[in-house]
């Protein structure tokens, strides 16, 4: 009998993973020069041992200057800036769902936890960060990506040492039905949190 796969067949994963990575690299304008797809399955004494999820890596090559390799310390007056896409009901609980066996949660929860890429938006955010880094004086005090738990993670780590004031009503909303919890915890992609020197806010706004 044909084996039933929970989501995709191995062949579909290999093809779609490669296509997806290449598509994102093309839209972002960055060559995809390395990558891998790793899985494992072994049967012994009528017992099957296998990775529950496929591991995929993709990458390129970049560089950074020594001046920009360490984050600065937040100071009173620094402005918290969020760059990138709007907030949607995307990636909710992504960190939790990715850490348990496939099928543990309902399909609805798992689908909400899946992140959706936006290469064009990532390119826009990248261009701003690169422009600031290539100036004679980098006005970025600290920077943090929006990973697991979205704004909750990113913004709290930016102001961890001193605390800060975040205006939720200024966070860009793409879906007006989002609750407060969904606004601060979603993992909508291609967003970056920055601490900016207060006197440079208008300059950053012009570049963005």
Regions found by a protein language model. Name each.
Residues 1-208:
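Glycine/proline-enriched, intrinsically flexible loops and inter-domain linkers
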